[in-house]
From Swiss-Prot:
PANTHER family: DETHIOBIOTIN SYNTHETASE. This is ATP-dependent dethiobiotin synthetase BioD. The lineage of its organism: Bacteria, Bacillati, Actinomycetota, Actinomycetes, Kitasatosporales. It catalyses: (7R,8S)-7,8-diammoniononanoate + CO2 + ATP = (4R,5S)-dethiobiotin + ADP + phosphate + 3 H(+). Pathway: Cofactor biosynthesis; biotin biosynthesis; biotin from 7,8-diaminononanoate: step 1/2. Its cofactor is Mg(2+). Its main location: cytoplasm. GO terms for cellular component: cytosol. It holds the Pfam family AAA_26. It comes from Streptomyces avermitilis (strain ATCC 31267 / DSM 46492 / JCM 5070 / NBRC 14893 / NCIMB 12804 / NRRL 8165 / MA-4680). It is an enzyme of class 6 (ligase). ATP binds at residues 12-17, 50, 109-112, 170-171, 200-202. Its EC number is 6.3.3.3. It is found in: Cytoplasm.
Length: 238
């Protein structure tokens, strides 16, 4: 079963565009891809969600959203306030396993960070990853403050004995500041895992054709791309 869980060090760090890039590269390689969004928050029933955006950018992927809540809150809180049933880790794992039967790759995109609560039983994305025995790809921000949140996420993955695939910078600025440039070396050091890509800021605004053409150059070979961490860092020496 090939399942990759994608989490962030927080909200708005580029999880969806990173998920789309991984999906686009896999689709271009001829793999069948499914994208699972366990809980979509802050989106009305008539609006497009994160899984829809991944499909728009990446192309021919299967999408599945298990639950949707209108308020932009943690899933457990959003479900409770909406009077709707929450989604638990076992439901997430079961849905991912079913998708894996008919797809070469299943991408599970979380909400917020690794320990954001899905339900009132304190279930998290980490619990779902453990049930699936699936590695977790961590999407981090580029600038000041990212080292602490990335290291905390990495430590929690190791404490729970969950596979840690590596780190992707979800939005690399066009003109990176000193902290961002230094973090190219510091992020993999504090994470204890490789830097597996850097998505250009604004990549989600590209046309689908442009996004799919660019995606391989944003991701390392371990994610199916051609991006090289050393070559990238050499262009941004602090």
């Amino acid at each position: 079963m090939s399942v990759l869980v994608i989490t962030g060090t927080g909200t708005e760090v580029g999880k969806t565009v990173t998920t789309a890039a991984v999906a686009a590269v896999a689709v271009a390689a001829g793999r069948s891809v499914a994208v699972l969004k366990p809980a979509q928050t802050g989106v009305r029933p008539d609006e497009r969600g994160d899984a829809d955006e991944v499909a728009r950018l990446a192309g021919a992927v299967t999408t599945l959203e298990l639950a949707r809540y209108p308020e932009p809150l943690a899933p457990a809180t959003a479900a409770r306030r909406a009077g709707l049933p929450p989604v638990g880790p076992h439901e997430v794992a079961e849905a991912a396993a079913k998708l894996a039967v008919e797809h070469d790759l299943v991408l599970v995109e979380g909400a917020g960070g690794l320990l954001v609560r899905f339900d009132d039983a304190d279930g998290t994305l980490a619990d779902a990853a453990r049930l699936l025995d699936a590695p977790v790809l961590v999407v981090a921000s580029a600038g000041l403050g990212t080292l602490n949140t990335t290291e905390l996420t990495a430590r929690e993955l190791r404490r729970r004995e969950i596979g840690f695939a590596g780190v992707v910078i979800g939005s690399w600025p066009e003109s990176p500041d000193l902290a961002s440039r230094c973090n190219l070396a510091d992020l993999p050091a504090v994470a204890g895992a490789g830097l597996l890509g850097a998505i250009p800021a604004g990549a989600g605004a590209h046309s689908p054709v442009g996004f799919r053409a660019g995606a391989p150059g944003w991701l390392a070979p371990r994610l199916g791309g051609t991006w090289d961490a050393d070559t990238f860092a050499s262009a941004f020496v602090p």
